[in-house]
C-alpha cells in the first residue's frame, strides 16, 4: 500500500493511526491544510500500539466505583475508547477517499476532539493515583469498524452507534461518580457527554446525506455485522440529547423498543 504524500492531511491520518508511541497518540503534530490529489483507497488493518497499552482479547468488566482504583480503571477504559475513536476517524479519512471533502474534514475535527478527551481522562486517571498502562485494554472498536464497506455504514456504527450510546453512558457514569463522592470525575463525564452531541449530529447529518433519510430500519441494516442496536443504546435513552443530535422521535421509539429476534418474548 502506497503511503500518503508528506505534508498532506492523509499523511497526518496515516501517521496517527500507525504511531507506536504514547506521545504521538496524545499529542500528534498539527494537521496540515493540504489534501492529497486523487488519493487511492487505503484500509489500514490495525493501529500502531504503544508498549504502555496492554491489549487483551477480553476486557475486565468495570465494577465498583467507590474506590479510586475502580474509578481509575473505568476512566482508563473510557480513554482507550476515545483513542480508538480518534484512530478510526483518521482511518476513515484514508478508507473513503471518494467521500466529500467536507465529510472527511469533519472526521479530522472529531478526531482532534477525541484526542482532547483523552487528555481529560489522562488527567483524571493521574488524579486518582494511576497512569495510562496500569490496566489492560481491548481494541473492541477496531474489531468491528474496519468492516464498514462505505461512509454510510461507518457513521451508522460510529456516530449513530457508539457515540450515541455514549450520551447514555456518560450520563450514567456521571451519576455513579457523584454517588461515589467524586464530583470532579462526574463533571468530566458530563462535559464529554455534552461535546458528544455534536459528534452524533455530524453522524446523523451525513447518514441522511448518504442514505436519504434517518429512519430506524435504514440505519439498522447499515450496521456492519454482528453489530446490532442492542449495543448502540444505554438505559434509559437520553432522549433530549439524542433529539438535539438530530435523531427524530420515531427513530428513538424504534430504538427503545428493539430487541433481538432470539430473545424470549420477542
Q: What are the residue ranges of the model-derived segments?
A:
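Non-heme di-metal
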Residues: 1-266
Amino acid at each position: 500500500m502506497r503511503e500518503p504524500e508528506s505534508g498532506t492531511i492523509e499523511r497526518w491520518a496515516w501517521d496517527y493511526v500507525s504511531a507506536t508511541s504514547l506521545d504521538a497518540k496524545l499529542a500528534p503534530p498539527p494537521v496540515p491544510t493540504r489534501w492529497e490529489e486523487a488519493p487511492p483507497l487505503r484500509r489500514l488493518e490495525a493501529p500502531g500500539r504503544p508498549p504502555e497499552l496492554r491489549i487483551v482479547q477480553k476486557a475486565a468488566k468495570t465494577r465498583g466505583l467507590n474506590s479510586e482504583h475502580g474509578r481509575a480503571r473505568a476512566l482508563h477504559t473510557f480513554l482507550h475508547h476515545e483513542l480508538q475513536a480518534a484512530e478510526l476517524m483518521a482511518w476513515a479519512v484514508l478508507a473513503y477517499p471518494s467521500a466529500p471533502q467536507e465529510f472527511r474534514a469533519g472526521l479530522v475535527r472529531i478526531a482532534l476532539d477525541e484526542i482532547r478527551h483523552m487528555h481529560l481522562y489522562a488527567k483524571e486517571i493521574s488524579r486518582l493515583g494511576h497512569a495510562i498502562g496500569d490496566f489492560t485494554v481491548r481494541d473492541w472498536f477496531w474489531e468491528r469498524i474496519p468492516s464498514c464497506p462505505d461512509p454510510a455504514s461507518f457513521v451508522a456504527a460510529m456516530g449513530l452507534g457508539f457515540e450515541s450510546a455514549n450520551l447514555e453512558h456518560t450520563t450514567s457514569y456521571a451519576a455513579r461518580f457523584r454517588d461515589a463522592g467524586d464530583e470532579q470525575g462526574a463533571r468530566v463525564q458530563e462535559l464529554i457527554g455534552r461535546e458528544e452531541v455534536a459528534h452524533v449530529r455530524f453522524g446523523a447529518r451525513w447518514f441522511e446525506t448518504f442514505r436519504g433519510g434517518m429512519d430506524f430500519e435504514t440505519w439498522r441494516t447499515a450496521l456492519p455485522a454482528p453489530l446490532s442496536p442492542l449495543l448502540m443504546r444505554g438505559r434509559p435513552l437520553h432522549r433530549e440529547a439524542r433529539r438535539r443530535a438530530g435523531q427524530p422521535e420515531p427513530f428513538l421509539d424504534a430504538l427503545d423498543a428493539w430487541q433481538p429476534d432470539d430473545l424470549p418474548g420477542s
